[in-house]
A protein has these predicted regions:
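Short, acidic, metal-binding catalytic loop of nucleotide-sugar glycosyltransferases
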Residues: 41-52
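Glycine-rich, basic loop-to-helix element that forms the pyrophosphate-binding segment
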Residues: 67, 84-101
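Short aromatic/hydrophobic "clamp" motif used to bind/position activated sugar donors
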Residues: 106
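Catalytic core of nucleotide-sugar-dependent glycosyltransferases
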Residues: 3, 160-169, 223-231, 236-263, ...
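A conserved acidic beta->alpha catalytic loop
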Residues: 59-69, 86, 110
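Conserved donor NDP-sugar-binding/catalytic core segment of glycosyltransferases
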Residues: 118-151
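Conserved nucleotide-sugar donor-binding catalytic segment
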Residues: 160-243
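N-proximal low-complexity "stem/linker" segments adjacent to membrane-targeting elements
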Residues: 1-42
Length: 334
C-alpha cells in the first residue's frame, strides 16, 4: 500500500523473467462451488491454451463446500487453485487475484458468473486495436440462481468502440458488472487495487470510475457476460441495515475527486438522486415482504443521499404506509 492511498493494495509488476500469457482469468470464490462448474466450463470452452491464458481459482477459505474438488474434476492441471489460509473478505481476495495474475489482461470472474462464447476473442480485439485503452467491457445479461436470463444491461452506444465522455456516464451510477470487464494489468499497477474502506458495496464501481478518470475505455455491444443475481440479496444484512447505501454514499464522496471541478457538484447531485431513488425502491420491496426494519433503514439512507421534494414525498408516503401497518399489526394482536 502507498502512503498516498493507504487503503489500496499495491499491485507490483510481474517479474521480468516470468513467462506472461495474454490473459489472466482469475476466479475469486467463497461458498459457491455449486456454480463454479458452470463458471469454469464457460471459460474452458474458450481456452486458447496455457501459453495464452492463465486460469486460476482463488478461494477465500470456503466453509460450506469444496471448490478445489470442482477445479480438479473439471479443470485438472489446466486450472490453478489457491486457497487463503484464513477468510480475508472479498476485497482482499480480489487483491490476491490481482497479485497472483501474470497475464497482460486481467479478467476477474466471480465463481458464480459466466462468459458467453466470443468474450475473450471480442474483448482482446478491443485491446489489440486500441493500445491506449485501460479497460474494455461488454454488455451483460442478468441471470437467476437457476441460470435463467432475466434482463440485459442498457446499450451504452450503438457500435463497439471507445466510449466518449465515459467518465461523466459511469459516475452517475454503476453501469458495469465485474464479469463483463477486462483491465490491463499495468492499470492496476498504476492505480492500485480495490479500496478497502468498503464493507459490502461500491468497491467495484469506485474502481471503474477511477479507471475512467485516467484511461479511455472500450465497449463491446454484444452481451457476452452473465451476472448472477441471488434471491437472498434482498434479505441480506447489508440491505436490511442500509449498509449498502452507506457504502454507496462513501463511494460518491470518493469519486468526486476524479471529476472536473466545474462539473463535480452537478454530477454528484445527480448520482445522489439516483441512489436515493434506488434506496426507495429497495424500501418498497422490503415493505412488501413485511420487513419494516429493513424498509425504514432504506428510507433513512435515501433521505441521507438526497432531501429534495423528489425524494421526500415518496419517502413520506412509504413511511406513512409502514406506520399504519404497525398500528394494524398491534390491533390484530389484541
Amino acid at each position: 500500500m502507498s502512503d498516498l492511498h493507504p487503503y489500496r493494495e499495491r499491485i507490483p509488476p510481474v517479474s521480468y523473467n516470468t513467462e506472461r500469457p495474454i490473459w489472466s482469468v482469475m476466479i475469486p470464490t467463497y461458498n459457491c462451488a455449486n456454480y463454479l462448474r458452470e463458471t469454469l466450463a464457460s471459460v474452458l470452452a474458450q481456452d486458447p491454451g496455457s501459453d495464452m491464458m492463465q486460469i486460476e481459482v482463488v478461494d477465500d477459505r470456503s466453509t460450506q463446500d469444496d471448490p478445489q474438488a470442482v477445479v480438479e474434476e473439471l479443470g485438472g492441471d489446466r486450472v490453478g487453485f489457491y486457497q487463503q489460509q484464513k477468510n480475508v473478505g472479498h476485497i482482499r481476495n480480489f487483491e490476491t487475484c490481482l497479485q497472483r495474475s501474470r497475464g497482460k489482461l486481467i479478467h476477474l470472474l466471480h465463481g458464480d458468473d459466466c462468459v458467453r462464447d466470443g468474450f475473450y476473442r471480442q474483448l482482446q480485439r478491443g485491446f489489440d486495436e486500441n493500445p491506449s485503452i485501460g479497460a474494455a467491457f461488454c454488455r451483460h445479461m442478468f441471470m437467476d440462481e437457476e441460470g435463467h436470463w432475466s434482463y440485459i444491461s442498457d446499450l451504452e452506444q450503438l457500435e463497439s468502440g471507445i466510449l466518449s465522455n465515459w467518465l461523466e456516464q459511469i459516475v452517475l451510477r454503476q453501469r458495469i458488472q465485474t464479469p463483463s470487464i477486462v483491465v490491463r494489468r499495468e492499470v492496476y499497477e498504476q492505480l492500485g487495487g480495490f479500496d478497502r474502506r468498503f464493507s459490502c458495496w461500491g468497491e467495484d464501481w469506485e474502481m471503474w470510475v477511477r479507471i475512467a478518470a485516467h484511461y479511455p475505455v472500450w465497449y463491446e455491444v454484444e452481451p457476452l457476460a452473465l451476472y448472477r443475481t441471488r434471491s437472498t440479496s434482498l434479505s441480506g444484512n447489508s440491505v436490511r441495515t442500509g449498509k449498502n447505501i452507506q457504502d454507496i454514499r462513501k463511494a460518491i464522496e470518493m469519486v468526486r475527486e476524479y471529476l472536473p471541478k466545474e462539473r463535480a457538484k452537478q454530477l454528484t447531485q445527480k448520482t445522489l438522486t439516483h441512489y436515493a431513488l434506488f434506496a426507495l425502491g429497495y424500501a418498497s420491496q422490503l415493505a412488501a415482504k413485511g420487513d419494516t426494519y429493513g424498509a425504514k433503514n432504506q428510507i433513512r439512507e435515501a433521505l441521507l443521499c438526497q432531501s429534495s421534494l423528489k425524494i421526500i414525498f415518496p419517502a413520506l408516503k412509504l413511511s406513512t404506509k409502514l406506520y399504519y401497518r404497525q398500528i394494524l399489526d398491534k390491533i390484530r394482536k389484541y
